Amino acid sequence: MSFIDPYQHIIVEHQYSHKFTVVVLRATKVTKGAFGDMLDTPDPYVELFISSTPDSRKRTRHFNNNINPVWNETFEFILDPNQENVLEITLMDANYVMDETLGTATFTLSSMKVGEKKEVPFIFNQVTEMILEMSLEVCSCPDLRFSMALCDQEKTFRQQRKENIKENMKKLLGPKKSEGLYSTRDVPVVAILGSGGGFRAMVGFSGVMKALYESGILDCATYLAGLSGSSWYMSTLYSHPDFPEKGPEEINKELMKNVSYDPLLLLTPQKIKRYVESLWKKKSSGQPVTFTDIFGMLIGETLIHNRMNTTLSSLKEKVNTAQCPLPLFTCLHVKPDVSELMFADWVEFSPYEIGMAKYGTFMAPDLFGSKFFMGTVVKKYEENPLHFLMGVWGSAFSILFNRVLGVSGSQNKGSTMEEELENITAKHIVSNDSSDSDDESQEPKGTENEDAERDYQNDNQASWVHRMLMALVSDSALFNTREGRAGKVHNFMLGLNLNTSYPLSPLRNFTTQESLDDDELDAAVADPDEFERIYEPLDVKSKKIHVVDSGLTFNLPYPLILRPQRGVDLIISFDFSARPSDSSPPFKELLLAEKWAKMNKLPFPKIDPYVFDREGLKECYVFKPKNPDVEKDCPTIIHFVLANINFRKYKAPGVPRETKEEKEIADFDIFDDPESPFSTFNFQYPNQAFKRLHDLMHFNTLNNIDVIKNAMVESIEYRRQNPSRCSVSLSNVEARRFFNKEFLNKPTA
């Protein structure tokens, strides 16, 4: 990997698009020709088409039997001024069977000047005159935010949250240990992380959150980040109308009931019909639909069935006074022909924004999935419901959905299923979509009249619904293939210019615990090619992008928390990832996160995997910067693993188990149980299995509260010694300076 420059960044060039506005005013003497006019009076309408822009075809309404129509309809196009843009105007006659073209004209937009507004006449068939009003202006307010900095809403949240945490930490730690908390500048930024792992991760994280809530640790956290299964629990918790007034204890009881049912009950004919009809509505509006949409509906029906209309934006009310940690969710953008271990862009989701920090491009959550061009929305859709995002965040399970439901007839269970998920790559779930162009630009000119169009759409819907129903209720190719299972959305970076530049990196002077040389970077954790192509850019010409479960690259959401602008001091991570056995080393995902961080020049403590050989399996491990005076920006990590150790002997910290029943309920294995009750592919948890896993992680967390408190005290001291402790100051990020490109292109000696 010696060819990789660790300071390489891909940024979006600041650029401007043009907004071209057309008002179709009127037409006079519309004719079908002498013979045609004898048979019928025209029913005219106008189609506008610019091939170089998305959402390229527009049309007016039609008037029955009117040769002098007055439309006064306004249409807007977003244009790239660097392309040749030609407006094609087609005068149409609406007919019952198929509409008729009455004439076509073109107008080259390069003749328009910015700020100009004019009326332009067009003549058809030497008789008909049509008047269009045209204007051109610069799009000065794009819908994407181009910046590496945090959004203003998150900055405001952080300031409010620090005020709350200051008082909460004093209460938690006591006056002596919190004596260093003089102001909000002394408040450390604490982040809590949950891994993927299906319902095992979700149930385990529910126990964790109960313990953190009861102990007061949650009140001291700024961020809560989840991946796949943990993100499902976070979605369930934050979308609950009674949270945070009602704590996880009550909400977890509802969750236990919801996951006790057979998932096949979700596939009753009535429910399937409702799912598919809802998806048809999305498809017919012009949005891509994949199996991940269906999976999201099933997850939603299981976990948030009484609030299926909830959106990510609506979760703002849970943090509007900084009363809870800011929830962060994630997925990956992947390429069809590249393993996600080699290339993946991390996409982050919060109630405030969705975007990719790699490129510094962010949008409001309600715009995710809308059609963009050059940073401006050209077609806005309704905000995707939260359950759609839950399907995307955990989409690895839609790949082997037949295994989840047990409809394939396969008898393989347990570790075999884990291994199968382990071997999935993005190439298995992302089809190479050859039909990337807009459907609308491929349509023939004209449409049928409203009645015929309605009949045509109804036939299409019936056919599509029938195919989807048959695929869902039978062991069809849809279950047996992994192709095309990824989530798919319109590419919000379509048409942008990406510039590979080499900044005077704000990270370059940071001293990490151990600088990685080429040999260390080449050391594989899971795959010889891991992260080989992470510096490659997204394809800004592709009209749609594929988004998949982040666990397909590594199973902990560290990239969200390691964003330099967030300046996190203490990370408490909970790893529910599958292991070959209960006695296997638990650091694979953490080592991948470390390697990713080092390759991106982000501070990260050295993870010593040999601590497992020296100390054996423990409930949690602490990894610190060895020299905090030098490694001023390196966070401390407390890493909890899924292990049943002290829980077998104690029903609460310091309270031994005494009765036979108490001992039997705690005597279980996680990964060595031949019945595999905690398999990643288990989507039904009987009450006993739920309670065992929930109570285990509740105990493990409470049993190590002092470890967390001590780390908080140390983090306060680090803050006092280094008042500006933050990986990158927000002002520096916005003021980045770049090397001269000509200098960079000079040959090296």
UniProtKB/Swiss-Prot annotation:
It is an enzyme of class 3 (hydrolase). The gene is PLA2G4A. Ca(2+) 2 binds at residues 40, 43, 93-95. Pathway: Membrane lipid metabolism; glycerophospholipid metabolism; Lipid metabolism; arachidonate metabolism; Lipid metabolism; prostaglandin biosynthesis; Lipid metabolism; leukotriene B4 biosynthesis. GO terms for cellular component: cytoplasm; cytosol; endoplasmic reticulum; Golgi apparatus; Golgi membrane; nuclear envelope; nucleus. Residues 6-122 form the C2 domain. InterPro entries: Acyl_Trfase/lysoPLipase, C2_cPLA2, C2_dom, C2_domain_sf, LysoPLipase_cat_dom. This is Cytosolic phospholipase A2. Residues 1-178 are annotated as: Phospholipid binding. Interacts with KAT5. The modification Phosphothreonine is found at residue 268. Transmembrane segments: none annotated. Pfam families: C2, PLA2_B. Its EC number is 3.1.1.4, 3.1.1.5. It comes from Equus caballus. The lineage of its organism: Eukaryota, Metazoa, Chordata, Craniata, Vertebrata. It catalyses: a 1,2-diacyl-sn-glycero-3-phosphocholine + H2O = a 1-acyl-sn-glycero-3-phosphocholine + a fatty acid + H(+); a 1-O-alkyl-2-acyl-sn-glycero-3-phosphocholine + H2O = a 1-O-alkyl-sn-glycero-3-phosphocholine + a fatty acid + H(+); a 1-acyl-sn-glycero-3-phosphocholine + H2O = sn-glycerol 3-phosphocholine + a fatty acid + H(+); 1-hexadecanoyl-2-(5Z,8Z,11Z,14Z-eicosatetraenoyl)-sn-glycero-3-phosphocholine + H2O = 1-hexadecanoyl-sn-glycero-3-phosphocholine + (5Z,8Z,11Z,14Z)-eicosatetraenoate + H(+).
